[in-house]
Amino acid sequence: MQTNLSRFINFWLFTLAIIVLLMIAVGGLTRLTESGLSMVDWKLFMGIIPPISQADWIKLFEDYKQYPEYQIKNVNMTLDGFKYIFWWEYGHRVLGRIIGLVFIIPFIFFSLKKSFTKSEYIFFVTLLFLGSIQGLIGWWMVKSGLDINPYVSHIRLAVHLIFAQIILSIIFYLLIKRMVKKKYQSISLSHKILFLVFNIIIFFTVIYGAFMAGLDAGQSFNTWPKMGDNFVPENLFFWEEKLFGILDNSVFIHFFHRILAYSSIGIIFVIYIFYQKRIDNSFQRIHLFSILVLVLIQLIVGIFVVLSNVQVSLGSIHQVVGTFIFLLSSSYSLNILFR
């Protein structure tokens, strides 16, 4: 019976990982299509019911018209145009509720059956906490764009994205821990330190990627390897308030995002070259190699995103690949630290 329950838990974790990944992808498309402010209220239970009649649609559209995004940016929007952006935000919110149900019901069942180890239970409770506040963070983010300035705060967007990727990484770590019986090796202290540095770089790359999306900083330069006519762009350090320039100067944000990407490639190459032959666990070697390959793919995709002036489909692919890098690198670190 316990073996069957263990298989069900693994399947449950895999299902959760797929849905959360889909949630992140839809969230990225919601941002890229500028659909995030189409739903101007937040209803936990009633919010899952979509508009059915024409009267429902007109009511929602009229509500949307009361806010600055319509009045300043979309004053010529038709009802059909509103429907397009509405469905993206609606789908994103419904997926959030589905994730909640898919998590909480099996979690209660498996907890009552005492199917988790003590360490697993701590991680699952952490997931419950993170998931519970993620919805509130999402609404906190949306509210930032319902004010006088009809733009979602790029800082709140980054917080929302990071929380989602941390949730996905913990799920993936638990899945690996349960399915891969041979423990991951921590070759040396330098191995741990280098991978910690790599994770920090990836963490800030994701944050600055969210800043790029939130401020449309990717559209400020559509050239590579130069940024405009220079490798180091003009106005890089031009901001009125020095402290906040690193957070809201689109030129600096774009430049720093590129520097972080180049740095991540250099460090993962060093880690792979120096440590992969010393790893006995074949799955761990594949895990490490996958990170290396994805980082290289991400660089190529990122270049095409810039050259295309942030085409929506390429931007979405860029975010999804970045999510895979984050979850693989963080789950790798968790496995060498907590196995």
Predicted feature residues:
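Polytopic transmembrane helical bundles with strong interfacial aromatic enrichment
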Residues: 1-339
